[in-house]
Swiss-Prot record:
It comes from Bothrops jararaca. It comes from the Eukaryota. It is found in: Secreted. It catalyses: a 1,2-diacyl-sn-glycero-3-phosphocholine + H2O = a 1-acyl-sn-glycero-3-phosphocholine + a fatty acid + H(+). This is Phospholipase A2. PLA2 catalyzes the calcium-dependent hydrolysis of the 2-acyl groups in 3-sn-phosphoglycerides. Expressed by the venom gland.
Length: 15
């Protein structure tokens, strides 16, 4: 799922 991948990137970017 792309959503899962995007969530991971978003989390990393947020941190």
């Amino acid at each position: 799922n792309l959503m899962q991948f995007e969530t991971m990137i978003m989390k990393x970017a947020g941190q």
